[in-house]
C-alpha cells in the first residue's frame, strides 16, 4: 500500500474504513428523514447477557435478605473518596432513586426507573443529576457481588427504599422485575432545547404554566420536575406551586401525594452549594477517559464533603437530616423565611430567626451548625392554600404523613412497571391499587373452538372483527406497560366513547361478542381477541392460505370500579396509522406519529410494514375509508397492498393536503387513493425494502405468516402472565 495514501499531511494516518465517531451521518445530510432507529433499540446484539438470559429466572436465585443487609450496611460505610454526609448515604441514595423514577410522565409512559437508564446519556449528565454518578459507584460493589441476579434498575430503586428504612420509615413494599437496557434510549423526547437549563418559555404556549408542552413533565431541560430556585430561577412560591401542580400531575400524582413526596424527599439529606458551580468540571458523558465516567470535578477545597456542589443551594431542611421524622413541617411552618443567596449564588429561603439548637450540624464537624434552608418548592407548600392545608394535616399527624408518603413513594417508584403481575420478590404488597390497572384472573376452561364457531356464524364482517380486536389491543404501551386487550376496557368508560374507537360501530359489535362470551363462558376480553383471529383466518383462507392464528386463553374482564377513568385519558388514540386515521392535523407528520405509536407498541419496522399492508386489504380503515386499500379483493389477506404500491404502471399525484391519487400511467385513470401513511412504505428507502419483500410473487404465504406473527404479538403484548 502506498504510504502517501494512508498518511496525508496533518491527518489521521489510518484509512477510514468505519464511521465510528466523526463522519457525517445520514441524519446530517437528511435531517427530516423518518428515523426508524427508535424501532430497533435494545436489540439482543447490544445485550451482553445474551438472548437466552432470563432476568425473571435469575431473580429466583437472589438472596434478598442478604442483599438488603448489604444495602443497610452500605448506608453508614462512609468512603474516603466520596464521604457520606453525617456518615449516612441515605439522602444521596434517595435522590438517586427519586431522579431515576421521577423522569416518568403519563402522557406517553416514557421515562421512569424501569430500565436503569440513569446510567446513560443524557440522564447521567443532566445538571439535576450532579453527583449521582458517585451514588452509582458506591453501589457498584453490591452490583458486582450479586451480578446477573440483580439489575441496575432494581438496585437503584431498592437503594432508595432501604435508605428510607435505615432512617426509620416503614416503607409500603418493593417489587423486583426491572430489566436493564444497554444503551441510551432514542425514543424519549426530553425537549427541543440545545442548552441545559434554558429558559422555560420555549416549553409553554403562554404565561399560563398549565400550557407545558406535551408530553414533557419537567419545566426546563435537564431538570427532573421544577426549578428549586423558582420559575426560571426567579423565586415566587405561588408560581412555583403552579409548576409543581402541573409537573406532579404529569407524574400521576395528586395534591396530597405531591406534598407528601416533596416533604418526604426533603425530610432527610441536604442540598449542596458550598462553592463556585462555574468551576465544576465536565459532566460524565464529556469527561476524559482518565476520569472513568465520573464527572463534575470540583476544585474547591477537598471537592467533597462540606465542599460538595450539586444544585447550588446549600443546607439541610431539618434539624436531624438522617432520621425520618416530622422535622420538615416543624421547620417550615414554625419559622418565618427570607430570601438569601447560597455560597454558590443560588436563591434559597432561610429562617429570619432560629434557635441555635434547631440548626442542623455540619456534615463533617458536629460542633458547627448552619442555617437550614428551603427551596422555592418547599415554600410553595406553605403559601399555596391547598398545599398548606395538606401540610398542616401532615404536621399534626406524623403517622398519617408517613403512611401517605410510603404509598406515594411506592407509586413513584413502581408506576412505570405496569400491572402487578409483573411484580417479583418477597416484599410485593398484597393490596391491589387502582393505579395498577387491576384485571381479575380470566378463565381457561372454556371451549375455544365453540367460541370461534359462534363468532364465525355471527353477522359481523371481517373488517368489524379485526378492527374491534385491534382497537382493544392497540392501547398497549411498552413504555409503562399500560393498556392492551386484557381486561376488555374497550367496553368501559372512557374507552367505549373514544372517537378513535368509532363508538357506534364498537357498541354494535360488542353486543354480539358479549352475548357469545356469556353463552360460552369465555371472557369478553378473550372473545374480542378471538374475533380478530377468526376474521384473519377467514381472510387468509380467501387468499388461498389455511392458517390457525395462535391463541392463549386467560384474559380477564375488569370493571368500572377497577378503572381510574381519568388516568386512562392519556391512552386515548389521537391517530392510528394502522387504520389510516388522524383525529386532526398535527405539527408532527402522520408517519412520525405512526412511528411513535409503533415504538410504544413494541413493534419493529418490519412488523409495522406487514401489519399496515394486511390491515389495509382487510378493510379496517377508520370510518371505512378506501385510502390505501390497494386491492380489488378487499377482505382477503393478500399482498396486494405491496404489489400495487411498488408497481411502476402507476403514478402518484397529490390532489389534496396529504392525499394522493394512484393513476394508471397510460390511461390516467384513478385506480386508488392514498394518504402519506400509505405512500411512505414506497418512498422511504428502508420501508420500501420491506415492502418489496412482501410484494414478491414467492412471498405471498410468508406475508400471511408474518402478518399473523405480528398480530399475535400485539394481541399478547399485555399478557405478562404468559411469561411465567
From Swiss-Prot:
Entry's Gene Ontology molecular function annotations: catalase activity; heme binding; metal ion binding
Covalent cross-link site, Tryptophyl-tyrosyl-methioninium (Tyr-Met) (with W-98): 225-251
Transition state stabilizer, annotated site positions: 95
Amino acids binding heme b: 266
InterPro entries: Catalase_peroxidase, Haem_peroxidase, Haem_peroxidase_sf, Peroxidases_AS
One Pfam entry name: peroxidase
One GO cellular component, as annotated: cytosol
GO biological process: cellular response to hydrogen peroxide; hydrogen peroxide catabolic process
PROSITE patterns, sorted: PEROXIDASE_2, PEROXIDASE_4
Cofactor entry: heme b
Region described as Disordered: spans on this chain: 1-20
Record keywords, A-Z: Heme, Hydrogen peroxide, Iron, Metal-binding, Oxidoreductase, Peroxidase
Enzyme Commission number(s) from the entry: 1.11.1.21
Active site, UniProt feature: 99 (proton acceptor)
Posttranslational mods: Formation of the three residue Trp-Tyr-Met cross-link is important for the catalase, but not the peroxidase activity of the enzyme.
Cofactor note: Binds 1 heme b (iron(II)-protoporphyrin IX) group per dimer.
PANTHER family cross-referenced by the UniProt entry: CATALASE-PEROXIDASE, HYDROPEROXIDASE I, BIFUNCTIONAL CATALASE-PEROXIDASE
Cross-referenced HAMAP family: Catal_peroxid
Subunit (UniProt): Homodimer or homotetramer.
Name of this chain's protein: Catalase-peroxidase
Organism annotation: Pectobacterium carotovorum subsp. carotovorum (strain PC1)
Taxonomic lineage from the root: Bacteria, Pseudomonadati, Pseudomonadota, Gammaproteobacteria, Enterobacterales
Gene: katG
